[in-house]
């Protein structure tokens, strides 16, 4: 029997290595004692962006939701996270418009779509690390309008048919202003709002998670911390502070048993 168990283990490991689908991901639902709005957080869609998956895992572990609900999927692209690659089956964030039936990400894409379209979900955040530091005007190769880091990303100004949270630019601007008023680790870490104007200007972004959400009348934003910030603790703190701003806008009440402005304390919990 011990030999059989060993053989089963080997078969299991080999089948995992040569799996024809990406691993399933876990959804955590944190519900307050008082009902309210529901925030859906997607992390780890790109496997080489640790700020985008450590932050939601940290949120799941160390936050309590008192009013409203927060649904967290911290690791939707596990195979790529393990490989520390953007997407070992191709870019997962470019599969929300069309996807072939034999794509290894198909099951996970369908699962994410069904979560986005869930009637309970009021707003979606997709967490990333992006290169450089977004600036409205070109400064140099790192600080420029084509960079993604330290920005809240929107696909358009507004979802016109939507009263609740449809004012994407206004919401993102509030988040930006509050983040920049708070403590930044370096002055050049300040946040911006990047509007990709997806429908008119960006064919690649038309394949993305947030654009899928927006075209289905679901407010969605990407939070991008900079890949040029090499300190993971700093990135996680920026991600968490961004998420907290969205929770405040959504009237989601929460508590945490640590000081978010205490770098050492967050670092200790993280590692």
PLM feature segments, named:
Residues 1-3:
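Short, Lys/Arg-enriched N-terminal segments with co-localized hydrophobic residues
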Residues 6-15:
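Sec-dependent N-terminal signal peptides
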Residues 20-271:
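Structured catalytic-domain cores with a bias toward divalent-metal coordination
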